[in-house]
Amino acid sequence: MINPLITKFIDWKHYNEGASKRTVEAYTAALLRFVVFLDGRDLLLATVDDVQLFGGIWLHKQGVTAVSRRPYIAAVREFYKWLTATKAIASNPTEGLSYPKTGRKLPSMMTLDSAEKLMWSPDFCTFDGVRDAAVLSLLLGCGLRREGVSSLNESNLVQMDFKGDRRYVLKVVEKGEKERTMPVPREVDMVLRLYLEHEDLKAIDRTLANGDKVLFVSLNNMTVPAHEYIGDRRRMAPKAVGEIVKKHGNKAGIPAGQLHPHALRHLYGTELLESDVDLLIRQELMGHADPKSTAIYTHLAMRKKMAEADRANPFTKIRTPVGDLISKLRKPS
């Protein structure tokens, strides 16, 4: 049975605006799909984050291309514009909802099979292999953007007690956002510790003027004189983060369309969605939270977020060298 609000809107669109039969059918199909996305939640209570998630990663996960998503977004925008005009709702959640850019094809989401192959590629017997594994782990296990990984300093890693263990929590600032604090899944935590405790890293001068240290270092920047190759000039560039994905992806035989840092972020977001992680936690972990809608919360309990990150990140569904080590350590002797 079609929601009465949708029926009223479609009738208005058809009789008042003279919309064609084809438009009416397309809008109806789009809104019914939005109802499926809401999964029983009231249409009148949809938030900015709901419509953004629907028009973006959810439809993308359903196999709807950027071009094909435009009619869905048009239907949802028109529907909520009508609800606002009829005073059924106080504010329009789609006001800032834009159409997807179609000038360039979005990178494919990396599959779990590809992610597993990728994580087996770095050589843990070498320093650059451990460094690359740590970079890939943050992209896959925390859903960071390449700029976010590049900008990290050691001070962005903070330790907390969690179920008797010392675990890392990550302070992240991406794309001009306010700083957000997110948990580091267990496997990612272990790879980061392997990297930070490596003897080769200790020999590199990566200290900044404020006493902090660059987290991820470049190893072969030939454009910088040796005596200047210290501090912030040792920082791995965002472009180099993408090159690490391509290098190990090509080595593992992964399709070229998946070899982009954002393809790993898409997989991370999809796993959170498919694992039924609470919407508010999902928004915080992805950095999608709307400050207006979350201002009433001081913060979510970090232990709750840590448990969800351990449960729902892509590493829980793939086999990796570090995952095998964790499994062995957990077995009783």
Protein language model regions, located:
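Conserved catalytic core of the tyrosine transesterase superfamily
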Residues: M1-S333
